[in-house]
């Protein structure tokens, strides 16, 4: 039987002007609750979302990794446009070295035009962003595995780039992918394939496309871990779960806007079809602070039942 793993997507936005001490106390309470049960901590990588407070992803995750050595950690997912790929390789290698091998490199092509424009980044068409991501992955892999990395691409280039200490072991590379080109890229370069807030009906179609992409590049689909990331609100009753989740979580799910919302029994029922399709890792955004009901029920009832 495949073991099911949970990861916690820590709140990075909607802080509601929370004082630092309150936020850190709430976060520490949550991490203490899931320690030994959840395997990992994750954070989104966005710079802004309207007028909401937003923590920067790499800085925050480095802080968390230093304080909580019992967890693996990663992003859901890094926007490749925000940082030069050679710098990402260097930062990731450093984190892997200092953390003792706990870093997972989650990365994607980027999508939020608002934050690109606001922070002065060019926002090229999706095709270009996917091509940039492919070059970024080649550079990162080169710098992690070769004595000195050299790469000449259309968008990025490095020459004799020296990245020491080398990350050991190599961090798994997780790519968030839905479209045909991204699925092909994932099949070629990734160790993990991640989807976010996707219904099981849509996921079933994506799995067919993903497995076809793997065969096209000569790779066994079973070599690539399948993960799902998104919202989860769990409570003793479905009505209570809707109240806790509020407008932030979608209780009336659709193909591309899906969250787990309901009682422990319902959450288990919703997760099992994904597990049957090969998912063994769920990264869950669990409703923010200060309400920890979801985490308590996931630890006490849902995860044990899935691994029974």
What spans do the regions from the language model cover?
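Active-site mouth loops of central-metabolism enzymes
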Residues: 9-24, 78-85, 167-178, 253-265
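N-terminal small/glycine-rich loop or linker at the start of catalytic domains
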Residues: 1-18, 70, 111-119, 152-170, ...
